[in-house]
């Protein structure tokens, strides 16, 4: 049989799609597959961002040999971005870790020793010794974990269960604290429930798109392709893009707005004022479904209590608010006039009016998208609340083509970090550790003694750094992230604690990252389809995949590491006598026994797996671990607006958007006819709030924690580029992606470069009050900062831009502001 290249590719795609869907394969496609020595195809969500694209993975002889966009995936419809097309190569970097490595000298652990290969038993021996010593000397507050929005659903659930119920420590937090915490608190304050009410299907039905601090063209390129298609197919569709510098998303914008850093708060209040002044309030919606509250102000910047800015704040960390009347709210936003807004933001008046008109026009369906520009902000929660105000004033919410939409940056920042309760203050399904009723629900469901879960909120990400430095946190397990490179203020607040001889730091990772090389023990980790997994994307879509290949060498999944390490602790070693007295039958049992081998978790047999299906963890334990953990976790949300489908349904589908009730997913929450929790005749119901009403908040402009001055005369903003994902620990090991963008550069306005005698390609030292880094001047290209601002990506381990950043956070969400600090430049 002869086939052209075109026919070959087409037949191959058909074979892949059919195999993954469990369908019969046409004869010509079967022949092609046969010629390829039976490549096996299966579905998986992409390993990278929070979009949640579906891919088809081709494996042969124990390796991934091909990958392509899944034509049946509703998110991406067969398309991949540049990173997605190179997914197989992230698995096969030359420096992939294959065995545990401990710092040793003269055959013993030594903080200053060289990394030496050891066995898993030896690794767990050292970890056990360190954990038990700290627990005995200082108690649960001396241990901690920093996890990930890249954990699978059951990995995050197992980690939260092990720390909060097993070790009785709430000192567990995910790296989603650095990217999505402000979105979470914003959702909770306004709606009483986390995560977006809309979905990606809004794109094809919207009349206008407004991007707030979001470069979707590079950070969510597949969604951007759908927006581009919508914009170019209808001349009446509008796109507005707001940022502190021009980037690739501006190329499509009808209204591209560059504003002074932090002044987005002013623009948001101006639009609310415009809506009111032009009688554009949806009075019927507003009167039935909205409450008004005035927020507490002057809340500080999440810095150490001894910092002058914290000392000066009148209400540091306060999230209090009080009811207010409409007239009071009207008077509050009336201060944000067009003239004042233009002056404070640097945005021309006509551009501001054009933007406000999109929201005010009752005939325009508007979607607001935002990512890190909003969230990584010392008033990120306020920014989230203020954009909700615009949609609540106009009623443009919870309907096809209308709504506010917080985009996530990690593949399971929603499905894992947020939903299963891996934040230091959270429990599954939006429950929190400070609520006695919520703790009781968890303790009863987990069949552990009452009072096991601590009521005190644990250490969040930045607080963990500070506690390590201060010697209060002494054993620290970092999983599935590279926080030494990604977190703020490396020199002053992170590195000192990691290298403090009082502390022991473990890093679980597939590669020797900056974090791994700063640790004391490195555990080699299985990644992506080397394990069975589940992610939850930005539109509430939960997606499963099967294990498709084995991990190299002795690399083990995060789930295996957590569950097996739990065997090292008996209940009497971690729980006080008063707890054991409640359930004496738990004496002598290990944390593995009481958390992971319970009847509820272990009841699903291996026969639920196909005979030839890989699943290393379950086959080692003798029961279907992932299914047991998922079903135990899913119980928390069922009947409470977070309903997940039965486990097996997800392996058959291309993901389902919760709540899933009676087998049907939900596209638009809170509205009648779309959401099963909204009854006939209710219209809208924001059922996260006791009265079913959302909240409009009155919140003012407050300045950034640090701004340029005479000495440090430039704003610095950090972020990503299309070719690399986060710290580049995966993408920089893909030769094609590395060649496309080999090193970080400093994007700067040509006039700012000229006044400093700098030219494109020159080496330049970037200096802040905390550190310095040498980069390369770039006056052209994709990012075009205004005068007074420079932009630098953080993917390059040789240019640690977070040596420069300030560890100021939003005081409510504890999320770091990576977008605003002051720097100066010196020619090298």
Curated annotation (Swiss-Prot):
Alphabetical list of InterPro entries matching this protein: Asp_de-COase-like_dom_sf, CT_Nitrate-R-NapA-like, MoPterin_dinucl-bd_dom, Mopterin_OxRdtase, Mopterin_OxRdtase_4Fe-4S_dom, MopterinOxRdtase_cofactor_BS, Periplasm_NO3_reductase_lsu, Prok_molybdopt-oxidoreductase
Iron recorded as keyword: yes
Secretion signal, residue range per the UniProt entry: 1-31
Pfam families membership: Molybdop_Fe4S4, Molybdopterin, Molydop_binding
Binding sites annotated in the UniProt record for substrate: 794
UniProt subunit comment: Component of the periplasmic nitrate reductase NapAB complex composed of NapA and NapB.
Organism: Citrobacter koseri (strain ATCC BAA-895 / CDC 4225-83 / SGSC4696)
Cofactor(s), by name: [4Fe-4S] cluster; Mo-bis(molybdopterin guanine dinucleotide)
Catalytic activity line of the entry: 2 Fe(II)-[cytochrome] + nitrate + 2 H(+) = 2 Fe(III)-[cytochrome] + nitrite + H2O
Top-rank taxon, per record: Bacteria
Keywords recorded for this protein, A-Z: 4Fe-4S, Electron transport, Iron, Iron-sulfur, Metal-binding, Molybdenum, Nitrate assimilation, Oxidoreductase, Periplasm, Signal, Transport
HAMAP family xrefs: Nitrate_reduct_NapA (MF_01630)
Cellular location(s): Periplasm
Cofactor binding description: Binds 1 [4Fe-4S] cluster. Binds 1 molybdenum-bis(molybdopterin guanine dinucleotide) (Mo-bis-MGD) cofactor per subunit.
Ranges of residues in domain 4Fe-4S Mo/W bis-MGD-type: 39-95
Protein name: Periplasmic nitrate reductase
Enzyme superclass (EC): oxidoreductase
Positions bound to Mo-bis(molybdopterin guanine dinucleotide): 83, 150, 175, 179, 212-219, 243-247, 262-264, 372, 376, 482, 508-509, 531, 558, 718-727, 802, 819
Family: Belongs to the prokaryotic molybdopterin-containing oxidoreductase family. NasA/NapA/NarB subfamily.
Function according to Swiss-Prot or TrEMBL: Catalytic subunit of the periplasmic nitrate reductase complex NapAB. Receives electrons from NapB and catalyzes the reduction of nitrate to nitrite.
GO cellular component: membrane; nitrate reductase complex; periplasmic space
GO molecular function: 4 iron, 4 sulfur cluster binding; electron transfer activity; iron ion binding; molybdenum ion binding; molybdopterin cofactor binding; nitrate reductase (cytochrome) activity
Modification comment: Predicted to be exported by the Tat system. The position of the signal peptide cleavage has not been experimentally proven.
One Gene Ontology term from the biological process aspect of the record: cellular respiration
Residues at which [4Fe-4S] cluster binds: 46, 49, 53, 81
Taxonomic classification: Bacteria, Pseudomonadati, Pseudomonadota, Gammaproteobacteria, Enterobacterales
């Amino acid at each position: 049989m002869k086939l052209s290249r075109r026919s070959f590719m087409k037949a191959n795609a058909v074979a892949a799609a059919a195999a993954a869907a469990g369908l019969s394969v046409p004869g010509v496609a079967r022949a092609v597959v046969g010629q390829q020595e039976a490549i096996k195809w299966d579905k998986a969500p992409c390993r990278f961002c929070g979009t949640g694209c579906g891919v088809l993975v081709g494996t042969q002889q124990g390796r991934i040999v091909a990958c392509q966009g899944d034509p049946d995936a509703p998110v991406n419809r067969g398309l991949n971005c540049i990173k997605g097309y190179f997914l197989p190569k992230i698995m096969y970097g030359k420096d992939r870790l294959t065995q545990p490595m401990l710092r040793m000298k003269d055959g013993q652990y030594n903080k200053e020793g060289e990394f030496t290969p050891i066995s898993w038993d030896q690794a767990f021996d050292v970890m056990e010794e360190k954990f038990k010593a700290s627990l005995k000397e200082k108690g649960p507050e001396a241990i901690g974990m920093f996890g990930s929005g890249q954990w699978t659903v059951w990995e995050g659930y197992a980690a939260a269960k092990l720390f909060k119920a097993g070790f009785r420590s709430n000192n567990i937090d995910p790296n989603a604290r650095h990217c999505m915490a402000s979105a979470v608190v914003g959702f909770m304050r306004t709606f009483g429930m986390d995560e977006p009410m809309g979905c990606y299907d809004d794109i094809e039905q919207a009349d206008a798109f407004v991007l707030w601090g979001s470069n979707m063209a590079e950070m969510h390129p597949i969604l951007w392709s759908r927006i581009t298609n919508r914009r170019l197919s209808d001349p009446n569709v509008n796109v507005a893009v707001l940022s502190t510098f021009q980037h690739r998303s501006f190329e499509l914008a009808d209204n591209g707005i560059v504003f002074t850093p932090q002044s987005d708060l002013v623009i948001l209040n101006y639009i609310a004022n415009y809506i009111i002044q032009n009688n554009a309030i949806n009075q019927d919606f507003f009167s039935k479904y909205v409450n008004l509250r005035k927020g507490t102000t002057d809340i500080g910047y999440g810095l150490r209590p001894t910092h002058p800015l914290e000392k000066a704040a009148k209400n540091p960390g306060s999230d209090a608010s009080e009811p207010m009347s409409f007239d009071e709210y009207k008077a509050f936003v009336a201060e944000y006039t067009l003239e004042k807004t233009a002056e404070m933001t640097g945005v021309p008046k006509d551009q501001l009016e054009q933007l406000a008109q999109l929201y005010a026009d009752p005939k325009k369906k508007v979607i607001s998208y935002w990512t890190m520009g909003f969230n990584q902000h010392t008033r990120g929660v306020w920014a989230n609340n203020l954009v909700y105000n615009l949609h609540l004033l106009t009623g443009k919410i919870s309907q096809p083509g209308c709504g506010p939409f917080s985009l996530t940056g990690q593949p399971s920042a929603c499905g894992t970090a947020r939903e299963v309760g891996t934040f230091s203050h959270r429990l599954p399904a939006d429950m929190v550790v400070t609520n006695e009723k919520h703790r009781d629900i968890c303790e009863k469901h987990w069949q552990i003694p009452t009072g096991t879960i601590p009521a005190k909120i644990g250490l969040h990400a930045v607080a963990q750094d500070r506690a390590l430095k201060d010697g209060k946190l002494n054993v620290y397990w970092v999983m599935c992230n590279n926080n030494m490179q990604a977190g703020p203020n490396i020199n002053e607040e992170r590195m000192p604690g990691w290298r403090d001889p009082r502390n022991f730091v473990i890093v679980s990772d597939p590669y020797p990252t900056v974090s791994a090389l700063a640790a004391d023990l490195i555990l080699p980790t299985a990644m992506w389809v080397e394990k069975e997994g589940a992610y939850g994307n930005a539109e509430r879509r939960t997606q499963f995949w099967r294990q498709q290949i084995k991990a190299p060498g002795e690399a083990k999944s995060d789930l295996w590491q957590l569950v097996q390490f739990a065997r090292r602790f008996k209940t009497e070693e971690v729980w006080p006598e008063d707890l054991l007295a409640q359930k004496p039958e738990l004496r002598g049992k290990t944390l593995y026994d009481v958390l992971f081998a319970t009847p509820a978790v272990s009841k699903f047999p291996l026969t639920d797996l196909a005979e030839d299906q890989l699943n290393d963890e379950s086959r080692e334990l003798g029961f279907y671990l992932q299914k047991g953990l998922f079903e135990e976790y899913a119980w928390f949300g069922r009947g409470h607006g977070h309903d997940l489908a039965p486990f097996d349904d997800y392996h058959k589908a291309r993901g389902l958007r919760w709540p899933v009730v009676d087998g049907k997913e939900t596209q638009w929450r809170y509205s009648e006819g779309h959401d099963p929790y909204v009854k006939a005749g209710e219209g809208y119901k924001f059922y996260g709030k006791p009265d079913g009403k959302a909240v409009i908040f009155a919140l003012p402009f407050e300045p950034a924690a640090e701004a340029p001055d005479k000495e440090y005369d430039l704003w610095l903003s950090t972020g990503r580029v299309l070719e690399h994902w986060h710290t580049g620990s995966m993408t920089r090991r893909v030769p094609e992606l590395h060649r496309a963008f080999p090193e970080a550069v400093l994007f700067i306005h040509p006039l700012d470069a000229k006044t400093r005698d700098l030219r494109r390609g020159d080496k330049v030292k970037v200096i802040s009050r905390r550190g310095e880094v040498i980069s390369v001047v770039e006056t052209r290209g994709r990012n075009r900062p205004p005068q007074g601002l420079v932009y630098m990506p953080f993917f390059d381990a040789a240019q640690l831009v977070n040596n420069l950043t300030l560890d100021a956070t939003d005081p409510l969400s504890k999320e770091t502001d990576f977008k605003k600090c002051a720097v100066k430049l010196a020619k090298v």
